C-alpha cells in the first residue's frame, strides 16, 4: 500500500481540532440564535467523538469506539429534546432569540 494515501492519527486529530474550534467560535461569535448555539455544541461533541474513535483505533482497543456510540446516542437525544423545547418556546413567545430567553419569568 502506498504510504502517501494512508491517514494517520495526526490527520484525525487535526480534523477534530478544526471541529472543536468551529464549535467554540460558533458559540462565542453568535450569541443571538439558540439553534446555532445548539449546532455548535453538537460540533464540539462530534470533535470529542472523533478523538475517542481515533485514539481507540490507534491503540487497538474497541472500548473507545463503543463509548463513542453511547455519546452519539446521548447527543442525538439531547438535540431532539432541545429542539422540541425550542419549538414549544417559539410557539408560546414567537421568538427564539437568546435575549428573549433571558427574560423568562418564574
Curated annotation (Swiss-Prot):
Q: Does the keyword Cell membrane apply?
A: yes
What EC class does the entry list? translocase
* InterPro entries, A to Z: NADH_UbQ_OxRdtase_chain4L/K, NUOK/Mnh_C1-like
Taken from the record, one Pfam family name reads Oxidored_q2
E.C. no: 7.1.1.-
**What cellular component GO annotations does this protein have?**
NADH dehydrogenase complex; plasma membrane
Which residue ranges traverse the bilayer?
Answer: 9-29, 35-55, 70-90
Topology in the lipid bilayer is annotated as:
Multi-pass membrane protein
What one GO molecular function would you report for this record? quinone binding
Family assignment from sequence similarity: Belongs to the complex I subunit 4L family.
Q: What is this protein called?
A: NADH-quinone oxidoreductase subunit K
Q: Which organism is this entry from? A: Granulibacter bethesdensis (strain ATCC BAA-1260 / CGDNIH1)
Amino acid at each position: 500500500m502506498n504510504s502517501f494515501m494512508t491517514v494517520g492519527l495526526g490527520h484525525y486529530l487535526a480534523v477534530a481540532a478544526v471541529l472543536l474550534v468551529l464549535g467554540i467560535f460558533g458559540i462565542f461569535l453568535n450569541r443571538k440564535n439558540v439553534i446555532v448555539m445548539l449546532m455548535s455544541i453538537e460540533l464540539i461533541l462530534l470533535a470529542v467523538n472523533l478523538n475517542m474513535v481515533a485514539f481507540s483505533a490507534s491503540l487497538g482497543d474497541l472500548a473507545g469506539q463503543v463509548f463513542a456510540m453511547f455519546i452519539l446516542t446521548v447527543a442525538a437525544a439531547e438535540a431532539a429534546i432541545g429542539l422540541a423545547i425550542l419549538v414549544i418556546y417559539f410557539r408560546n413567545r414567537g421568538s427564539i432569540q437568546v435575549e428573549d430567553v433571558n427574560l423568562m419569568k418564574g
